[in-house]
């Protein structure tokens, strides 16, 4: 059996809370680039050995670490920039899609009292979420964006807004 020597080397430093890694070819280029999206709302790509900013939507992202009353705040949060997808014809049309938790949409939470499930008491399990219009943690959105010919990204339209009951388990690419 042939022995294979494998090693790792960092390709980027100081990228906090990465949530998505994707590759694509930018319009007008011929080299595939690695894109890194962060939970905080920054999207970077690596080009020519240098990390560059593709898009910064931190001002559009909900303030992480803020929760409804009754939820312990340990600093852990699963909201933020959760998804990045490039259109199959991104090279030609410049379309891409973002999924993120919207700034300013912090709600009161899904339940009027703290949720304390007890595995020995079936009445405390599988609670139903009754009033989605007023009792929610935040709103997630899916948006279509376009990369313009000048290299700047611009939002085209909102495709979906969803009220989420909790700050966690909101999905990632």
Feature roles, as predicted:
Residues 1-173:
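Acidic, Gly/Ser/Thr-rich repeat motifs that build Ca2+-stabilized beta-propeller blades
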